[in-house]
Regions:
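ATP/NTP phosphate-donor binding region
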Residues: 1-78
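Active-site histidine-anchored catalytic micro-motif
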Residues: 40, 59-127
Length: 127
């Protein structure tokens, strides 16, 4: 559990860079591209690495690679928010690879749904 009070990340504004990561299940590329297009239409600058399209059975790539992508986005001071491309099974696999201390030093908004519960719980209680 976290001993310190929760940190409030900054609000996002049009023009901000937003990272899109795939911490859990893979997704249809067309739906992803439509979502990225909508973020652009709203004035944001979505960013993602090519690994977001990886697939390994029922998850979006190797756990260590998904965690590296999340940590890279989290540690980028120019990115105020991170969006999960999709929920689904697999987010719990990232937890051993995440750095609480590093994440706590740079509060971010993290947006996700469905079965990102393990990751959202980790961020809420530890970061």
């Amino acid at each position: 559990m976290r001993d310190a009070p929760p940190l409030k990340p900054p609000a996002v504004r049009p023009g901000d860079r937003l990272a899109v990561v795939a911490p859990a299940s893979p997704f249809p590329r067309g739906a992803f591209e439509a979502g990225v297009g909508e973020l652009r239409r709203l004035g944001f600058a979505p960013e993602f690495d090519a690994g977001v399209f990886d697939r390994r059975r029922y998850v979006a790539g190797e756990a260590a690679a998904r965690a590296r992508a999340l940590m890279a986005a989290w540690l980028d001071p120019g990115i105020p928010a991170i969006l999960a491309a999709r929920g689904g099974y697999g987010s719990v696999e990232l937890l051993p690879f995440l750095s609480v201390d590093a994440m706590r030093r740079l509060p971010k908004l993290f947006v996700g749904y469905s079965d990102l519960t393990a990751l959202l719980g980790f961020l809420t209680t530890r970061c």
